[in-house]
Structures are given as C-alpha cells and as structure tokens.
Amino acid sequence: ISGDFAAIFDPNTLNQDLAIYNELPFTVLFVDGNHENFTLLNSYPVSMWNGGKVHIIKDNIIHLMRGQVYSIEGKTIFTFGGAVSVDQYRRIENVSWWKEEMPSEEELNEAKENLLKYNNQVDYIITHTCDAITIRNYLAYFRGKVSEIFMDNEMLDYFETNVKYKHWYFGHYHFDGKITDNKTEVYNSFYELR
C-alpha cells in the first residue's frame, strides 16, 4: 500500500480498522501517507525486517519506514512515505493532522546513506507522493490540472535524479494510472512486482 493506510488512526477503533487486513492470506506492507496518526503509528517499536526498519503492527501488517531498502523475494525495494496535506488549514494538529506527515531532513539523509549501500540502484521505489519533476512533466495530463509542488515533492527529486530503478509506485493523488513507462500512481489497483 503506497500510503494513506489510515487503519492506524483512531485508537478506539484500531482493532476494528485492522480486522479486514488480519483476514487476508498474505502480509500487508505499507508506507505511510499524509493521513496517518503518527503518534499512534510511531508508538510501535522499531524492528529490523528484510534489511530495513519497520513497525510490526500485527504479524501480517507491517509499516515500511521512510528511507529504508528491503530485500523481498530477491528484489530490492526502497521506501519513503509521507506527504504534505493540502487541507491542513481545516484539520486539527495531533487530532486529524500530524506534522510528522512531512519527511524530515534526517529521514532524507538516512535514505541517502541506505541507498549508497546499494550503489544508488534498486528494483522498486515506493513512496506516497511523487517527485516534483513528475508533477511538472506529467501529472497535469492525468489530473486535468497542475498539482501544487511542495517541499516533499522537491525532496523526492533527489531519488529521481540519483537513483536507478525499474519502477516507481506512489499513491497520493487518488487515481490509478501509468504515468510513464516506469512510474505508476496506485489507488485501488494491485500490481505484481516482478
């Protein structure tokens, strides 16, 4: 899941919100989006899993943390969740909006260090939002309007210009569509990583 997992949001309904995922016959992996309860999400202990840091929510529900590279079924997957909420003005801090939605410089630096261990080459990149280059060059054609560019998008430009990858998946813009030969916006669809 490429962000806005949102099942870890209300502590009072947490078990109910996770129930649908508990019943699935596979492990659910997700990067955080901007609509997450980061206080609750970050209350889970940090563990190492397949080469990178994670929050294990349940045995079959795992949060892939920002700036990590995982080896899964012979593939390398780099993750970097988070995004800016364009509707912050109508949300309440630490109730319906958390400042941790925006990736930090520390997370970016950790990402750069981890990617260097793989010579800046991975099979897949999974983020919540996308880089500013993609917004400027492609997203307007799919959404019928130009999306605003925020600091998080510019932060992700580093990965576009410095990392070799086969495919990049992101989910912030709430539609399904192949943007380029190697970039896909994911909303309700499933894609097999081959």
Predicted regions and their residues:
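Active-site-proximal loop/helix segment associated with metal-binding centers of metalloenzymes
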Residues: G52, D59, E73-M151
